[in-house]
UniProtKB/Swiss-Prot annotation:
Protein's UniProt keywords contain Lyase: no
Keyword check for Metal-binding: yes
Residues spanning the membrane: 5-25, 32-52, 60-80, 99-119
Topology in the lipid bilayer: Multi-pass membrane protein
InterPro entries: FluC (IPR003691)
Protein name, UniProt field: Fluoride-specific ion channel FluC
GO biological process: cellular detoxification of fluoride
Highest classification ranks of the organism: Bacteria, Pseudomonadati, Thermodesulfobacteriota, Desulfuromonadia, Desulfuromonadales
A UniProt-annotated Pfam family: CRCB
UniProt subcellular location: Cell inner membrane
Cellular component per GO, a single term: plasma membrane
Primary location: membrane
The organism of origin for this protein: Pelobacter propionicus (strain DSM 2379 / NBRC 103807 / OttBd1)
Length: 129
């Protein structure tokens, strides 16, 4: 029960963070490209790499907190469904190049951000950052 409550509370925080952060990014850059969704997914990808690597290599993050941060907060922050819908709408609107750029950029950049999170965690744990 404690884990489920932790996940639920953190998920609410992640959802609010996504709402405000993506809205802020869209306000800055407009909606011609799904920059808001890309931004929250990139941040989430970096953070999950960082959190999971720290959790696997040390005892700095207790198991319940790890669940809250990864399943809860990152689950609420990131959004594959919105990415899918926005890409579908771009295709439906005939913006094939923009849709392909979004799909490719999202996958490649999210993997890169996860890798950066992992190497950041390793450097922090080894004290070489």
């Amino acid at each position: 029960m404690k884990s489920a409550l932790t996940i639920a509370l953190f998920c609410a925080g992640g959802g609010l963070a996504r709402y405000y952060l993506s809205g802020w990014v869209y306000g800055l850059l407009g909606r011609a490209f799904p920059f808001g969704t890309l931004a929250v997914n990139l941040i989430g990808a970096y953070c999950i790499g960082l959190i999971m690597e720290i959790s696997l290599r040390s005892t700095l993050i207790p198991a319940t907190l790890r669940l809250g941060l990864t399943v809860g907060f990152m689950g609420g922050l990131t959004t594959f469904s919105t990415f899918s819908y926005e890409t579908f709408k771009l295709l439906e609107d005939g913006q094939y190049l923009v849709a392909m750029v979004n799909a490719l950029a999202s996958v490649v950049m999210c993997l890169l951000c996860t890798w950066l999170g992992v190497i950041t965690a390793r450097a922090l744990i080894q004290g070489g950052f």
